[in-house]
Structure formats: structure tokens, C-alpha cells
């Protein structure tokens, strides 16, 4: 059951089951071993927390055994939220809620949030919650997965005095983009034309009430403001808890915050390559199973591609363009192969062969290429699953 759900389920459920058992017992024609109705009944007994624990174990082993990339000695933790489209079923609507656009039909959505390591490509923690939950509240739920000695990268939707107070109380550092007109200290900083300054955030009125309602202190917080000029000419202001200019010079923060873009790319991969919105069931339970199962499989693929990338870096050293493993191909190769990896008593040879395939499928990296961002919706219908 667990291995089947980890196998990047995207097609018609009965076809996926037949192919799964064909991998376990190869033959010319896939045999009918388990019916979809039997599977649907059995999966009701599977707690989605099984996949959460698998992911936690994978992450712990990676950071214990592997060479970990850090930024100036700090682990980076990018936190961001998004939404997922869900089946329009009564149970999904009751569990997750809907968005009501002004000029279109209601959409059944879930709010998701991730703690992502942009340097090592791993999702450390993932939450799927009702659409009405806001990203700041989900950030608080992530705090148990955040450790001292790490730095949070936050988008402009997170800054609030109570959020910084919660991080400060737990001695967790941060770097966040802030809107130019939200904070008086930011407006004064911009008006003065300064590039780098330490200022003090003092809570007033609503900010104090928000802290008290959450049991947080209302003491003033010293922060550092840094002006960043983008190639487009746009000015961004970063607010950080890293006050020491010698350890963390101002010019280091633009490249630092740009690293957060890796999380946006991870969300794109999660939605478009892994097809997390292509659900295998319609209930709240099956949605949570699919979500956390695909988080684990994406993470496992990232771990294997990192290992393959070490071979690529060595083999292509001196090339005019650096090369990187093609993650889309790696995810395709994991389909079916993952079943063999997780069911064999000694999968080491298969693991080596898989990593070798990853290392042979690479693409050149050409930095500073810019393309317009196109937003579009590509939905999945429960009754129209792909044949593959």
C-alpha cells in the first residue's frame, strides 16, 4: 500500500495497480491482482502520518550522513505557501473549504506550506490545511521543524511584529522582504536614501494585541534594513535579524534572498512534474495520503540527484557551461524503479545503476536567462486520467 502510493500515481487507478504488480511480477501482460475497489477500501486504514514519518527519517539521515551546503555557516530554510486545487466533492469542500472569486465559479482549494532547504533541495516539513488558514499561522506550525543556527528566508506575505517575536523568542534568525509602505521605519529608511541601517521595531496597538493573544513578548526588536536594487531597476527592502555587518556584509544579501527562488521552482516541479493535484481519490484522507507521499518521493529523488550531481561536477569540470542533472527525467525514471528499490532485500546495485542514469542525463546551466512568467491553469479531471 505505502510503496504503491509512493510510486508517483498519476493515471487511472486500476491501470496503476496493474502496472504496479507487473513490476513486482514481470510478465507480457499485466495481471489483475488487486481491484481498485479493494484498494480503496484498504487505504482507509492507512494514516497519512506514515509518509510524514518516512520523510522525517529521510531528512534526518541526509543531514547526518551527507555533505550539507550552508550559507556562511548557516542552514537556510525558505518558508512559503501556495494553494492546491482539489476535487469538488462534498467531503473535500467540508474539510478544506472553497475560494469564491468575484467573476467565476467557486474553487475547492487547500492551503499548503513548506519548509525548504534551497541549497540542498529538500522539503524539510510540509503542511496541507484548509484554504482559510493563512500562511503566517502555518509558519508557526512549522516552528517545531526549525532549529537554532538556521536562517529563515521569508516572502513579503510573512512580516508582522508577532511573527518576528515568535522567531526571536525561539532564537531563530530570518531575512524577509518587506513592502515599502507597511512599516514607518521602512518608509523613513527609504525616504532617507540609506542602503543599510539598524532600526528598532516598536509594537503599537494591534501589534501588541496580536502578541498578547499568542502569549508572545511585546518588547522592541532590533532589525537591520538593507536596500537591494534589482537589474530591472526595482528597489526591494530586506529586513533581517543578522545585525553584524562584519559577519554579514550588505552586498551578501541580494544573492542570499535570490536563493529563495529555488523554492518557487520546487513548487513548480511539485505541481507540474509530480502532478500533486492529480489526485488518486476524492476524500480528505486520500488527498492527505497523496500529498505527503509525493513530498517523500520528490525528496528521495532530490537526494539521489544530489549524489549523481557529484559525479556530473567531476566529469564535466572545465566545460564552458556547468551541467546539472535533469530532474524531470529523474522523476520519470523513478516511476516503477522506486517499487523495485523499496521491495528488494539488497537494492544497492539497482541504486548505483539509477544514479548512473541520472548522471548521464544532464542539461547545461546558463545563468541570467530571463523569460516572461506565464500564469495558466491546467486542471486534472477524475474521469479523464492519462493512459500511461
Describe each region flagged by the PLM.
Residues 1-17, 32, 43-46, 53-55, ...:
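Single, function-defining residue in the core of a domain
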Residues 18-24:
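Short alpha-helical "recognition helix" segments of helix-turn-helix
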Residues 22, 67, 250-251:
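Short hydrophobic/aromatic segments of transmembrane alpha-helices and their interfaces
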Residues 24-40:
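Short, basic interhelical loop/turn and adjoining N-cap
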Residues 26-27, 46-49, 61, 276:
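A short structural micro-motif
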Residues 59-67, 137:
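A short, well-structured juxtamembrane/interface segment
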Residues 70:
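P-loop NTPase switch module centered on the Walker A-proximal segment
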Amino acid at each position: 500500500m505505502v510503496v504503491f502510493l509512493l510510486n508517483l500515481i498519476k493515471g487511472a487507478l486500476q491501470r496503476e495497480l496493474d502496472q504496479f504488480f507487473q513490476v513486482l511480477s514481470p510478465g507480457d501482460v499485466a495481471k489483475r491482482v488487486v481491484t481498485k475497489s479493494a484498494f480503496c477500501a484498504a487505504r482507509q486504514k492507512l494514516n497519512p502520518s506514515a509518509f510524514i514519518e518516512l520523510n522525517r527519517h529521510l531528512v534526518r539521515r541526509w543531514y547526518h550522513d551527507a555533505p550539507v551546503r550552508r550559507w556562511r555557516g548557516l542552514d537556510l530554510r525558505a518558508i512559503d505557501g501556495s494553494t492546491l486545487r482539489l476535487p469538488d466533492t462534498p467531503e473535500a469542500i467540508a474539510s478544506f473549504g472553497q475560494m469564491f472569486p468575484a467573476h467565476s465559479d467557486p474553487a475547492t482549494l487547500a492551503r499548503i506550506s513548506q519548509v525548504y532547504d534551497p541549497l540542498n533541495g529538500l522539503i524539510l516539513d510540509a503542511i496541507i490545511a484548509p484554504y482559510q488558514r493563512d500562511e503566517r499561522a502555518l509558519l508557526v506550525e512549522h516552528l517545531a521543524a526549525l532549529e537554532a543556527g538556521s536562517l529563515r528566508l521569508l516572502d513579503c506575505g510573512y512580516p508582522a511584529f508577532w511573527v518576528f517575536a515568535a522567531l526571536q523568542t525561539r532564537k531563530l534568525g530570518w531575512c524577509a522582504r518587506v513592502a515599502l509602505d507597511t512599516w514607518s521605519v521602512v518608509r523613513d529608511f527609504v525616504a532617507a536614501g540609506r542602503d543599510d541601517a539598524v532600526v528598532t521595531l516598536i509594537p503599537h496597538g494591534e501589534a501588541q494585541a496580536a502578541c498578547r493573544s499568542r502569549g508572545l513578548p511585546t518588547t522592541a526588536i532590533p532589525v537591520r534594513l538593507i536596500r537591494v536594487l534589482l537589474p530591472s531597476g526595482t528597489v526591494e527592502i530586506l529586513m533581517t535579524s543578522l545585525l553584524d555587518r562584519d559577519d554579514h556584509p550588505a552586498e551578501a544579501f541580494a544573492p542570499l534572498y535570490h536563493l529563495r527562488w529555488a523554492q518557487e521552482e520546487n513548487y513548480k516541479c511539485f505541481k507540474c512534474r509530480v502532478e500533486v493535484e492529480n489526485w488518486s481519490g476524492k476524500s480528505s484522507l486520500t488527498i492527505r495520503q497523496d500529498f505527503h507521499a509525493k513530498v517523500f518521493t520528490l525528496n528521495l529523488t532530490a537526494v539521489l540527484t544530489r549524489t549523481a550531481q557529484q559525479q556530473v561536477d567531476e566529469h564535466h569540470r572545465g566545460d564552458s557551461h556547468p551541467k546539472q542533472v535533469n530532474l524531470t527525467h529523474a522523476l520519470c525514471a523513478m516511476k516503477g524503479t522506486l517499487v523495485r528499490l523499496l521491495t528488494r532485500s539488497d537494492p544497492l546495485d539497482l541504486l548505483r545503476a539509477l544514479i548512473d542514469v541520472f548522471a548521464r542525463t544532464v542539461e547545461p546551466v546558463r545563468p541570467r536567462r530571463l523569460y516572461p512568467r506565464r500564469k495558466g491553469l491546467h486542471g486534472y479531471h477524475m474521469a479523464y486520467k492519462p493512459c500511461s
